[in-house]
């Protein structure tokens, strides 16, 4: 195999090499489709006058672009990737070449892009965001060149991956695939399709009101839609305006270990009729994934099966490090 970059534009020598290999492949296996999977989507110069011209010279059937999220090409890779997928889709609409996404399922045990550093499983929350970004842009198919040993069936007799966490990634992926309610709600937040069914208003500081404005942030600690909490105990009170049947609460948080940003260990939900006396309704552990040396991703905590009649809801947590939260969904539904 030969790996090359399509950045800043597809070099002429690379185009000629691809076409020569394609011709050879067709001579050996007539009638079969040809696929290439270059890296460099994050560093491509889409506005260069020759970018699309070089792409149009390629005589392949499929280009499966490495999304480079695992390789961490940017400090915050996903926000730019979302835009780049859209730009690449626009180009492919004028080409006779299928556009696939090659989603990187891994992160690095030590240094990034270092052959001495092992590839280990990424959190499924991050991978789902990659799937969503590619799907929204209209890719024709999503694949991954890293599955075995990264996404590991716990029932397999031959365990090749990182103990525990490769199984965790597999279980979460299969839960999403089978329509698990948490993963479908979380996916809807990534698609910006989750809404509050209950009419709610935040009580307290002005910046707390952003937690019920329906605006979700991206995987970037500088995004102004994140509400920032420092170390310590925090309580957020929500007025539902009237006595309401409370079924579930979903809280979104950011994970970015390099800036000491993470989820609280537990989330507590209390209810009250008068806003003075509160009763504990539920406690839920936040998700934990240890392979976080380099990655940025969004997580969520779902507190469901509440079955409470209440007007006021208090969400409480202890922050062992900085907690960034963008939205608290009360009785969330998918639009």
Predicted regions and their residues:
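Alpha-helical scaffolding within the catalytic cores
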Residues: 18-21, 40-55, 79-90, 127-130
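Substrate-binding cleft of secreted/luminal carbohydrate-active enzymes
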Residues: 67, 98-186
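Extracellular carbohydrate recognition and processing domains
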Residues: 279-304
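Aromatic-lined carbohydrate-recognition surfaces of secreted/lumenal glycan-active proteins
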Residues: 18-48, 65, 95-109, 144-147
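Active-site groove signature of glycoside hydrolases
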Residues: 1-12
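Predominantly extracellular/luminal regions of secreted and cell-surface proteins
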Residues: 187-219
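Acidic (Asp/Glu)-rich catalytic clusters
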Residues: 27, 52-59, 89-96, 132-136
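Aromatic, loop-rich ligand-recognition surfaces of beta-strand-rich domains
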Residues: 220-280, 301-335
């Amino acid at each position: 195999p030969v790996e090359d970059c399509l950045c800043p534009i597809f070099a002429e020598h690379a185009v000629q090499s691809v076409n020569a290999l394609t011709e050879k492949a067709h001579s050996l296996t007539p009638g079969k489709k040809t696929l290439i999977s270059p890296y460099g989507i994050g560093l491509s110069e889409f506005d260069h006058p020759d970018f699309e011209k070089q792409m149009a010279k390629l005589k392949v059937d499929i280009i499966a672009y490495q999304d480079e999220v695992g390789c961490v090409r940017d400090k915050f890779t996903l926000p730019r990737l979302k835009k780049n997928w859209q730009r690449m889709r626009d180009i492919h609409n004028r080409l006779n070449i299928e556009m696939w996404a090659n989603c990187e399922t891994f992160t690095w045990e030590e240094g990034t892009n270092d052959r001495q550093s092992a590839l280990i499983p990424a959190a499924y929350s991050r991978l789902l965001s990659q799937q969503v970004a590619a799907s929204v842009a209209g890719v024709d198919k999503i694949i991954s060149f890293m599955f075995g040993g990264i996404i590991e069936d716990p029932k397999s007799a031959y365990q090749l991956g990182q103990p525990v966490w490769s199984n965790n990634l597999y279980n979460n992926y299969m839960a999403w695939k089978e329509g698990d309610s948490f993963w479908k709600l979380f996916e809807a937040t990534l698609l910006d399709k989750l809404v509050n069914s209950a009419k709610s208003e935040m009580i307290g500081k002005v910046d707390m009101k952003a937690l019920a404005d329906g605006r979700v942030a991206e995987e970037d600690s500088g995004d102004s839609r994140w509400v920032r909490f420092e170390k310590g105990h925090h309580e957020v009170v929500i007025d539902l305006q009237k006595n309401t049947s409370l079924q579930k609460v979903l809280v979104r948080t950011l994970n970015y270990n390099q800036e000491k940003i993470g989820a609280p260990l537990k989330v507590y939900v209390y209810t009250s009729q008068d806003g003075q006396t509160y009763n504990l309704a539920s406690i839920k552990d936040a998700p934990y994934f240890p392979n976080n040396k380099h990655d940025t991703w969004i997580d969520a905590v779902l507190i469901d099966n509440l079955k409470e009649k209440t007007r006021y809801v208090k969400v409480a947590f202890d922050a062992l490090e900085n907690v960034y939260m963008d939205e608290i969904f009360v009785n969330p539904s998918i639009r």
